[in-house]
A protein has these predicted regions:
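Conserved ABC ATPase "signature" region
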Residues: 70-71, 119-137
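Conserved ABC transporter NBD signature motif
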Residues: 63-71
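Catalytic Walker B motif of ABC-type/P-loop ATPase nucleotide-binding domains
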Residues: 167-170
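Helix-to-loop junction immediately C-terminal to a conserved catalytic motif
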Residues: 55
Length: 252
């Protein structure tokens, strides 16, 4: 596989009064094209900070971030915005939908097509929404009429409608019940099966099991890595035991 993203000596610090809090420390990391990379670690280990730096949502303090062969860490804010629109999709724990728009229009608003209301685009959005369990009746509902799991599904469709090269997710099931969480993970698994590269932060083993690669952060550094087959291609019990064993070794 080819790296779609990689870092060189990546550092990220935050000012804490007169002191500097060093969150990511000289990190060299490759994110492979077509991989489902899961970032795990204890609270405060730098998981979300790393995700934001990789995605161009936050600039590193030092070091380099490459998207393919292109360095992005020195982009202006406007250049980063263009980069994100063209290449990245984002799904967060809290999904922010426009309250005055229904489900269909929320996704259409996020589309970058020149003709946002073209019949072709509307048809594609409707098909994607139906594929994640949001039928035509659901597509007419407004955000205040949706459950957490339903809103998250809208967020995922909105994130993939522009066919991003890489999808970033930060604790996407963190606020969902077990049933809704499983449904959302099934969608991510389907997206990955279609060839989508995914980078996801989680603290949940059930979520991590969906990945093909788990990296473990401690004090801003990668201290371990665990590889897995695509979800569904191996015995789930054995898969869980191996991942649990790896996390135990990491002191999780």
């Amino acid at each position: 596989m080819i790296p779609i993203l990689h870092t060189e000596k990546l550092c990220k610090s935050f000012s804490n009064g007169a002191a500097q809090q060093h969150v990511i420390k000289n990190l060299d990391l490759e994110i492979m094209e077509g991989d489902f990379t899961v970032i795990m670690g204890a609270s405060g280990s730098g998981k979300s900070t790393l995700l934001y730096a990789l995605s161009g949502m936050d600039k590193p303090t030092l070091g380099k971030v490459f998207f393919g062969d292109t360095e992005i860490q020195d982009y202006t804010n406007d250049q980063l915005a263009v980069f994100r629109r063209k290449n990245c999709g984002f799904v967060f724990q809290s999904i922010y939908l426009l309250e005055n728009q229904n489900v269909l229009d929320n996704v259409l608003t996020g589309a970058f097509a020149v003709q946002k209301n073209s019949p072709e685009l509307i048809k594609r959005v409707k098909e994607l929404l139906a594929k994640v369990g949001l039928d035509e009746a659901m597509q007419k509902k407004y955000p205040n009429q949706l459950s957490g799991g339903e809103a998250q599904r809208v967020g995922i469709v909105r994130a993939v409608i522009n066919e991003p090269k890489i999808l970033f997710a930060d604790e996407p099931t963190g606020s969902l019940n077990s049933t809704s969480g499983r449904d959302v993970l099934d969608i991510f698994t389907g997206v990955h099966e279609n060839g989508q590269s995914i980078v996801m932060v989680t603290h949940d083993i059930k979520t991590a099991l969906r990945g093909t690669r788990v990296i473990y952060l401690r004090d801003g550094k990668v201290v371990g890595e665990h590889r897995m087959a695509k979800y569904g291609e191996d015995d789930l019990k054995e898969r869980r035991e191996k991942l649990t064993g790896f996390l135990d070794e990491m002191g999780w």
